[in-house]
């Protein structure tokens, strides 16, 4: 069983891709090789293959990175399933994980959602998609400042407030306030719940 994230950047036509595209590629490239495990195509769409238990945290890393750019957002469709054909390019590989993810992206575009999941288990789908609808209310409203903090903490949870303050060139008290506003502890709890739920598959 594998996880596939198919995503597309919202409002990409209004922002210079030279600003966000290299950073997205750097993030995806830090996890695995292209084009076998990830690829950016059509200018603002991408696909990533990863392990099932990591797919939610990786989705949030992508989301928080894109939200560090003013007016940008991203739709993320998570497909869980099998892989029946492995190509040298992820966009040519096939299996239920790919089908679930690709079709789901089309569905959430129509529905106006930004995060959803499709597995072979209807109960898991129902439970996690209700969770995602609630969490997306928060995720979609992240400010650039909040997204910067969340992204750094997701990439490196061991970062101290002092180190974050230095990186972002702000005071430690500002870091503390941003972490509180970001509900980062709740994000971690949600990831833990996701991993537990996905283990039911």
Residue locations for each model-derived region?
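Short, Lys/Arg-enriched anionic-surface-contact patches
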Residues: 126-145, 197-199
């Amino acid at each position: 069983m594998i996880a596939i994230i198919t995503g597309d950047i919202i409002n990409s036509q209004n922002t210079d891709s030279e600003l966000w595209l290299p950073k997205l590629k750097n993030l995806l490239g830090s996890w695995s090789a292209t084009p076998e495990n990830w690829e950016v195509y059509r200018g603002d769409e991408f696909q990533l293959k990863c392990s099932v238990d990591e797919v939610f945290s990786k989705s949030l890393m992508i989301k928080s990175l894109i939200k560090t750019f003013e007016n940008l957002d991203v739709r993320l469709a998570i497909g869980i399933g099998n892989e029946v054909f492995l190509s040298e390019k992820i966009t040519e590989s096939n299996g239920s994980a790919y089908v679930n993810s690709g079709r789901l992206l089309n569905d959430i575009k129509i529905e106006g959602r930004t995060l959803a999941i499709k597995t072979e288990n209807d109960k898991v789908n129902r439970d996690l998609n209700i969770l995602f609808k609630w969490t997306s209310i928060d995720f979609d409203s992240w400010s650039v400042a909040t997204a910067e903090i969340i992204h750094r903490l997701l990439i490196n949870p061991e970062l101290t407030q002092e180190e974050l303050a230095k990186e972002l060139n702000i005071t430690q008290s500002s870091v503390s306030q941003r972490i509180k506003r970001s509900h980062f502890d709740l994000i971690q709890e949600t990831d833990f719940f996701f991993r537990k739920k996905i283990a039911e598959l």
